A protein has these predicted regions:
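Conserved class I S-adenosyl-L-methionine
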Residues: 2-58, 72
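Class I SAM-dependent methyltransferase SAM/SAH-binding core
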Residues: 62-118
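A short acidic, Gly/Pro-enriched loop at the edge of an enzyme's catalytic core
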Residues: 120-129
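Residues lining the SAM
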Residues: 132-136
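A short, conserved alpha-helix within the catalytic core of class I
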Residues: 138-151
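Short glycine-dipeptide loop
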Residues: 156-162
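C-terminal alpha-helical "lid/dimerization" subdomain adjacent to the S-adenosyl-L-methionine
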Residues: 163-214
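Core SAM-dependent methyltransferase catalytic element
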Residues: 208-227
Length: 227
């Protein structure tokens, strides 16, 4: 598959765009060190290796990744075969460019898309969708973010899974660094997770999936939903 860019909609909400816009090329250059190194270890108390293990457990040969960051996990994870089909979805062309370049050996297809809106994409027959560190960057409360699952489910085969991680704002341990970072990032519009909690995450998973599971490590919820 060749790389291509297509818009899922003509307009996007200001709040959703604010979170995506923070990922400039300069920020992405230090993202792995700042987020996957420092923040995961010292703020969220969720080692990056555990997220990589999570990817290895649920990744498939036909995979969509949403909110792609730098592509670290797609680069490091172990796909079931050496020739997976990968689609990348994000609002930010910078993250798509960086990730597509990083995993160019897989020749991914890229789409600029807002998952809070219906997705007019000709994608079907996928077995896994990854949402790593996406939900806490979206505006609104956790219950309103259930629309993301609704919009993505049509792209999955029967038995397919949506899996991901999200930093919760309530009901999980937050040390001083985590509290400061959460407050600052919400103020700047990078995060939208002040009111995100475990019970609401359970609710939107239950509403959208035949089966689901959640595990909390530090300030981070790991979730899987199967259709």
């Amino acid at each position: 598959m060749q790389n291509s860019y297509s818009s899922a909609q003509d307009t996007i909400t200001h709040d959703a765009a604010a979170g995506a816009a923070s990922y400039t090329k300069q920020v992405l250059a230090i993202y792995d060190f700042l987020v996957l190194g420092f923040a995961n270890t010292f703020a969220w108390k969720c080692p990056t290796r555990l997220i990589l293990d999570f990817y290895n457990q649920h990744i498939s040969n036909k995979h969509i990744d949403v909110g792609v960051g730098t592509g670290y996990f797609l680069d490091k994870c172990q796909f079931p075969s050496s020739h997976p089909i990968i689609c990348l979805l994000d609002l930010n062309p910078n993250t798509l460019e960086v990730t597509a370049k990083r995993i160019r050996r897989y020749n991914p297809t890229t789409f600029i898309a807002n998952v809070l809106e219906p997705l007019k994409l000709e994608l079907t027959g996928f077995d896994s969708i990854g949402l790593n560190y996406l939900l806490h960057c979206l505006p609104g409360n956790m219950l309103s973010k259930g629309v993301v699952f609704k919009n993505l489910k049509p792209f999955l085969n029967d038995g397919g899974v949506v899996f991901g991680t999200t930093i919760l704002g309530q009901g999980v341990p937050h040390n001083l660094i985590a509290r400061k970072m959460t407050s600052l990032y919400n103020y700047k519009g990078i995060f939208g997770n002040i009111n995100d909690n475990l019970e609401d995450l359970k609710t939107i998973l239950k509403e959208n999936f035949h089966d689901y599971s959640i595990q909390v490590i530090g300030s981070v919820a790991f979730f899987v939903g199967q259709i």
